C-alpha cells in the first residue's frame, strides 16, 4: 500500500539501437538465453534533434529554397529577387552550423534553456519535500516519492519508489563482492542480459531499465601530489586504478500505459502499478542474487539518499536545509554546466561507441576508463528500452563533477581526452545540461 506522495524526468535524448549495451565498472556484454539475443554491441541511431532528423530538415529546406528560385524565375524578375532572398535564408539555415548544430536546432535549444530558467525563477519548492530529494525536485517539480508496504508479509522491507504521476521507478543497489576495491575492473561483470530481460516480466512491460555507475576517485583530485594519501595510493592505482567509491544502481521505470492489463490485474490505479513494479524489481533482484551479486531494493529513504548521492548534493547543505524555515534554491542551470549546492556538473551524451568485444575494448574496461578521470565524481548512465519486438534501444550519458569551475574544466578535458583514447564519441550537452542531469540520476533514464 502506498503512502502519501512526497516528490518524470523527461530528457530529450533519444536512444541508440542495440541487442544490449555497455555498462558499469562491473559491466559486460549481455548474453541472453537464445542466440538471437546474444552479445551486446550498440549500433548508433539518430538522436532526437541531431543526426537523421536534421538531415531530413536540411533536405526539405534546400528543396524549398530551390523551388522558390524556380518559381521566382518563372514568374519574372519582380518575383525572382524576393524569392532569391528567402531561398538564400533557407539555404543558410540548412547549411550553417553553430557549435556542431544547425541554426534552427541551436536557436531552439537556446530558447528552451531560457524558458527553463524563467520557469525555475518563478517556481518555489513544494512544502514537505525531503531535503535529500530537493535538488531533483527543483529540476522536475512533479517528482514525488512513495513507499509500498507488503500487506501479507510485514517482515519484508518496504519498497521505495519515485514518480511524477506518469511513471514510477524503483531502484536496486547492486554489489559484486566485499573485495571490489582491489578486484580487477571486469572480474565480476554485470550480466546485462538479466537487466534486458526484466523489461518484460509476466506481462509487465517496463518503459526502461537504467544502470547508473557512480564513482569517486582515489585519492581525491584536490589533494596535493606530495601528500601521504596520494603516495600511499600510487601503487594501488598503478595496478588497478580502483576508485575510492563505486556505487551501482539499477533503476526500473514503469509507465502504466504500456501494460494496462497487468496493472488492472493487480488492482488498478496507483496500487496496481506499484505491485507491477515490485514484481519486476523482485524478479531482477532474485536473478542477480542467483548470479552472485548482492541486490537490495531501496526503501523510500534510501532512494532519496541515492538520488542525493548521484547529484553530489553537499551533505552539510542537505542537513541545514531541514532546519531552515524558507528553503533556498540549491540548483542552477547554465549553458555548459549545472550546479547543485557548491558542486558543478557537466553531462555528455555518448554519440559513438567504439568497437566492443572481440578485438575491441571490453565494455567493463571502457566504462571504467571513462569514469576514472580525476574529478570529484563521475557518473555513467546506460538506459535500455524496448525498440520493436527484438531490439533494445541504448542511451549512454557521462557526467563529471567538480568543486569549482576550474576543477570542472579540468575534469571535462580529462574526460574528453579519455574518450578520444578509447575512440568513443561524446558530445557535451550545451544548453541541455538539466535534461542531461536528469538522464544520469537513478530515475529510470532518458526520455
Show the residue positions of the predicted features.
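Catalytic cores of large soluble enzymes that bind and process phosphate-bearing ligands
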Residues: 79-83, 95, 99, 103, ...
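N-terminal topogenic membrane-targeting module
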Residues: 95-190, 200
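A short, structural micro-pattern
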Residues: 58-60, 166, 205, 242-246, ...
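An amphipathic, basic-hydrophobic helix/alpha-beta surface used to engage anionic
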Residues: 69, 170-291
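Short, charge-rich amphipathic segments
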Residues: 114-136, 198-223, 339-350
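Membrane-proximal, solvent-exposed terminal domains/tails of membrane-associated proteins
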Residues: 2-6, 232-447
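Charged, low-complexity, helix/coiled-coil-prone segments
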Residues: 47-54, 125-144, 218-228, 352-361
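N-terminal alpha-helical membrane-insertion module
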Residues: 1-131
Amino acid at each position: 500500500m502506498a503512502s502519501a506522495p512526497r516528490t518524470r524526468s523527461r530528457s530529450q535524448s533519444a536512444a541508440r539501437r542495440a541487442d544490449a549495451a555497455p555498462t558499469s565498472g562491473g559491466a559486460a556484454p549481455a548474453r541472453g538465453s537464445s542466440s538471437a539475443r546474444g552479445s551486446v554491441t550498440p549500433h548508433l541511431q539518430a538522436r532526437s534533434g541531431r543526426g537523421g532528423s536534421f538531415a531530413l530538415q536540411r533536405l526539405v529546406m534546400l528543396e524549398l529554397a530551390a523551388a522558390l528560385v524556380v518559381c521566382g524565375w518563372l514568374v519574372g524578375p519582380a518575383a525572382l529577387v524576393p524569392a532569391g532572398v528567402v531561398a538564400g535564408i533557407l539555404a543558410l539555415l540548412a547549411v550553417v552550423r553553430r557549435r556542431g548544430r544547425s541554426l534552427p536546432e541551436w536557436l531552439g535549444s537556446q530558447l528552451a534553456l531560457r524558458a527553463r530558467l524563467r520557469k525555475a525563477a518563478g517556481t518555489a519548492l513544494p512544502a514537505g519535500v525531503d531535503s535529500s530529494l530537493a535538488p531533483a525536485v527543483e529540476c522536475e517539480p512533479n517528482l514525488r516519492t512513495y513507499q509500498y508496504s507488503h500487506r501479507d508479509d510485514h517482515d519484508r522491507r518496504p519498497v521505495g519508489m519515485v514518480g511524477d504521476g506518469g511513471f514510477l521507478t524503483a531502484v536496486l543497489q547492486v554489489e559484486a563482492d566485499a573485495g571490489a576495491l582491489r578486484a580487477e575492473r571486469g572480474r565480476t561483470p554485470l550480466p546485462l542480459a538479466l537487466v534486458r530481460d526484466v523489461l518484460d516480466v509476466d506481462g509487465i512491460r517496463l518503459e526502461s531499465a537504467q544502470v547508473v555507475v557512480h564513482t569517486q576517485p582515489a585519492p581525491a583530485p584536490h589533494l596535493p601530489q606530495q601528500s601521504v594519501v596520494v603516495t600511499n595510493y600510487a601503487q594501488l592505482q598503478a595496478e588497478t586504478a580502483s576508485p575510492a567509491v563505486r556505487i551501482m544502481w539499477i533503476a526500473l521505470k514503469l509507465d502504466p500505459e504500456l501494460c494496462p492489463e497487468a496493472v488492472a490485474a493487480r488492482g488498478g490505479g496507483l496500487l496496481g502499478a506499484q505491485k507491477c513494479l515490485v514484481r519486476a524489481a523482485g524478479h531482477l533482484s532474485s536473478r542477480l542474487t542467483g548470479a552472485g551479486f548482492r541486490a537490495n531494493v531501496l526503501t523510500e529513504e534510501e532512494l532519496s539518499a541515492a538520488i542525493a548521492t548521484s547529484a553530489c548534493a553537499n551533505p552539510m547543505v542537505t542537513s541545514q536545509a531541514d532546519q531552515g524555515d524558507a528553503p533556498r534554491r540549491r540548483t542552477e542551470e547554465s549553458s555548459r554546466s549545472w550546479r547543485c549546492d557548491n558542486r558543478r556538473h557537466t553531462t555528455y551524451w555518448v554519440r559513438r561507441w567504439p568497437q566492443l568485444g572481440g578485438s575491441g575494448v571490453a565494455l567493463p574496461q571502457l566504462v571504467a576508463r571513462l569514469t576514472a578521470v580525476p574529478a570529484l565524481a563521475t557518473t555513467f548512465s546506460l538506459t535500455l528500452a524496448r525498440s520493436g519486438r527484438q531490439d533494445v534501444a541504448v542511451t549512454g550519458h557521462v557526467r563529471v563533477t567538480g568543486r569549482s569551475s576550474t576543477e570542472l574544466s579540468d575534469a571535462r578535458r580529462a574526460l574528453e581526452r579519455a574518450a578520444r583514447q578509447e575512440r568513443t564519441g561524446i558530445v557535451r550537452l550545451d544548453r541541455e545540461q538539466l535534461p542531461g542531469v536528469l538522464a544520469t540520476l537513478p530515475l529510470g533514464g532518458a526520455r
